[in-house]
Amino acid sequence: MIISHKYKFVFIGLPFSASSAISKELHLQYEGAPYLRKHSLYHEFEKVATKNEKDYFVFAVLRNPMEIVVTVYEKMKANSKGNFTNPDLFSENGGHITKKHREKFNFIHDNKASFQEYFLNFFIMPFDNFSSLTLDNCDFVIRYENIADDYILALEKSGVSNPKPLPVANKTAGKKKDLSLYYSNEIKDRTIKVFGPFLSKYNYPFLESWGEVKVPLSSKLQFMILGFLRKVNQKYFKKLPNTTEIKGTIYGDMQRGKLN
């Protein structure tokens, strides 16, 4: 989470939604300061914010979950930075790599699992993430697929005059994956059950080649019930990790005043 007292805005960084790149730019260009954890949610901010801070302009980024799941799979498969095998990053040591992450990582590598095998093994219930716990409290939501323009618009709405373009926006747009290469007909029915309620809620389409898609009522009901329980758990029972990120990360260096 980033807060700027000069421009009176709060940026809520959601995972796998360019949060590091945006946080860095807000810090360097708009006097944005790290606030709580990198991925702290609005209800956490609300508990500690002053009355004045609660009036700040709040924004976040929403990304298609079908893209997020592919991105996570590819990151685990490549493990290019060694994150999933670095004990310093494990959640029990204060990092962000959970036991569930490692279970998925091991499944992919032990079985040389394709995306379809990975998806069928781990994605059964309707998908939901921190977006549902956050976006209702936002004054503006940047759509990841339109990040370059929406980032500028968010800053303009917060009162920034002539905001600078996000440096990684064009690079991010160029990374867009062909989802049809991952979501094959083999997993079509499961994909609809898993993503249908979330995509409907946030106006995302399924693959065009699939034509008209009908989301099962059972998935919609599960999404609603599990979403409610998740909100209650996050707000009242979830034990939050340390607010200080590890050294060498963008947010961790920002917290230590060492980001240039």
Regions found by a protein language model. Give the residues of each.
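Membrane-interface amphipathic segments in extracytoplasmic regions
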Residues: 1-260
